[in-house]
């Protein structure tokens, strides 16, 4: 275990609540807590068993004044999250009391933790690897049950296990090559022929490709689908956002141009997180404020993963409608024909022609009809209706995906070398490169600056 000083931070969100927790970790965690904790029975925390909780008060050692009534948990190394001694002081929720306790802890020998430092220590002390540490962030930020399940799988080490198995295969192959090169006279060691080397490399490439095949779905679950709602003014875009969000998030009126800016909302559609973006109606306008909103809408359109194009069932198609179809050509689009509670004036055959095989859903948002069909269309478009079975390991982190792509390229370079008859000692350079890249995923071959950058994304106290 690495030697560190003792750190402390508030581990619960600030604000009013039932409890707030000050967490300490390090060799002096119990000693510092003992300076402040007073039990009604007079017992000291250094004498209590590990993984126990105790009632008492936090007392200012200088004045002897009671600061807070608390429950204190004592957990001794190595069976803790950081593999260090950990103390958690459970205070009443609120701003004042928990900050008073934290200030006393800091005044008595602890240092204020940096963002993510508790998890960083868990990594540096070998409690978790880097991919598991990153999964902690994903778990905190998960917007749906399925996104949370993917994060939990990664925290449990499912991805780590696969990566380590691939690294071990490469390492054994490299060792075999080295033995053949250094000790060619050993007849009892199987020769690493180009055919055998190719089999090993192709196996590793196949496993990497299998992981990468989950990347699109994994990133959607982790980051959400950037879903932009577009359409002429007053076709029901804001009503659609409200319907999917199941609340009145956007203003709905009969006045065209009510939405003058971009409104964002996270919604859960059948386990798929959507970052739903309601845009200002795209049209030519003299209103300066609305014009700015329209320009922002155009910019959001370029970054969208999914576009919900809303039309008015009660009105004929216009040049603006047709222009929107042209703007979204080649993109993932679901066409929504809204206001079907009113008489039909739209040319549905022309809509089908413009949609060019893309899904069309009829809705009456006013009457709450068609929402289920729309949600199914979204799930069908990206996940074939349902996510894969729970035993599939998803790759959802952009850093992991990039490293897997690079490792695959290194393996392919090795295979190309084998095909052209390159000596095996040169082929192993590419194999070693793949081994190192895979090691960066779990943190075995990662630079310290990257570690600092990754853990800086965490909140204080985690």
From Swiss-Prot:
Keywords: Cytoplasm, GTP-binding, Hydrolase, Magnesium, Metal-binding, Nucleotide-binding, Potassium, tRNA processing. (6S)-5-formyl-5,6,7,8-tetrahydrofolate binds at residues 23, 88, 127, 462. Its cofactor is K(+). One of its GO terms (biological process) is tRNA wobble uridine modification. The keyword Iron does not apply. It is found in: Cytoplasm. Its main location: cytoplasm. It comes from the Bacteria. GTP binds at residues 234-239, 253-259, 278-281. Mg(2+) binds at residues 238, 259. Belongs to the TRAFAC class TrmE-Era-EngA-EngB-Septin-like GTPase superfamily. TrmE GTPase family. HAMAP family: GTPase_MnmE. This is tRNA modification GTPase MnmE. It comes from Geobacillus thermodenitrificans (strain NG80-2).
């Amino acid at each position: 275990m690495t030697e560190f000083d003792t750190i402390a931070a508030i581990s619960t969100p600030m604000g009013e609540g039932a409890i707030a927790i000050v967490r300490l970790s390090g060799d002096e965690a119990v000693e510092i807590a003992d300076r402040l904790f007073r039990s009604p029975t007079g017992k000291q925390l250094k004498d209590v068993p590990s993984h126990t909780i105790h009632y008492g008060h936090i007392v200012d050692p200088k004045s002897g004044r009671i600061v807070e009534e608390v429950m204190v948990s004592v957990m001794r190394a190595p069976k803790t999250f950081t593999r260090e001694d950990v103390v958690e002081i459970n205070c009443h929720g609120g701003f004042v009391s928990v900050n008073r306790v934290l200030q006393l802890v800091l005044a008595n020998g602890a240092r204020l933790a940096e963002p993510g430092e508790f998890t960083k220590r868990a990594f540096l002390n070998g409690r978790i690897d880097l991919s598991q540490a990153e999964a902690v962030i994903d778990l905190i930020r998960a917007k749906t049950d399925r996104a949370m399940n993917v994060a939990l799988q990664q925290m449990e080490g499912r991805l780590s296990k696969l990566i380590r198995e691939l690294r071990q295969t490469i390492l054994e192959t490299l060792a075999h090559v080295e033995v053949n090169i250094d000790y060619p006279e050993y007849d009892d060691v199987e020769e690493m022929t180009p055919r055998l080397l190719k089999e090993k490399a192709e196996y590793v490439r196949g496993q990497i490709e299998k992981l990468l095949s989950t990347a699109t779905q994994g990133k959607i679950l982790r980051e959400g689908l950037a879903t932009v709602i577009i359409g002429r003014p007053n076709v029901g875009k804001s009503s659609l956002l409200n319907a999917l969000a199941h609340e009145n998030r956007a203003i709905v009126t009969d006045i065209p141009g009510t939405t003058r800016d971009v409104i964002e909302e996270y919604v859960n559609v059948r386990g798929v997180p959507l970052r739903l973006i309601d845009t200002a109606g795209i049209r030519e306008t003299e209103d300066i404020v609305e014009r700015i909103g329209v320009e922002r809408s155009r910019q959001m359109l370029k970054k969208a993963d999914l576009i919900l194009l809303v039309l008015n069932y009660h009105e004929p198609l216009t040049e603006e409608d047709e222009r929107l179809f042209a703007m979204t050509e080649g993109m993932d689009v679901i066409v929504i024909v809204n206001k079907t509670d009113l008489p039909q004036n739209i040319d549905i055959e022309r809509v089908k022609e413009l949609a060019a095989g893309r899904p069309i859903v009829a809705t009456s948002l006013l009457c709450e009809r068609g929402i289920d069909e729309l949600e199914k269309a979204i799930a069908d478009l990206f996940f074939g209706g349902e996510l894969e079975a729970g035993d599939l390991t998803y790759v959802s982190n952009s850093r992991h995906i990039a490293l897997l792509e690079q490792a695959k390229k290194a393996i392919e370079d090795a295979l190309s070398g084998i095909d052209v008859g390159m000596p095996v000692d040169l082929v192993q350079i590419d194999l070693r490169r793949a081994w190192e890249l895979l090691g960066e995923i779990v943190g075995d071959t990662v630079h310290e600056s990257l570690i600092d950058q990754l853990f800086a994304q965490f909140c204080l106290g985690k």
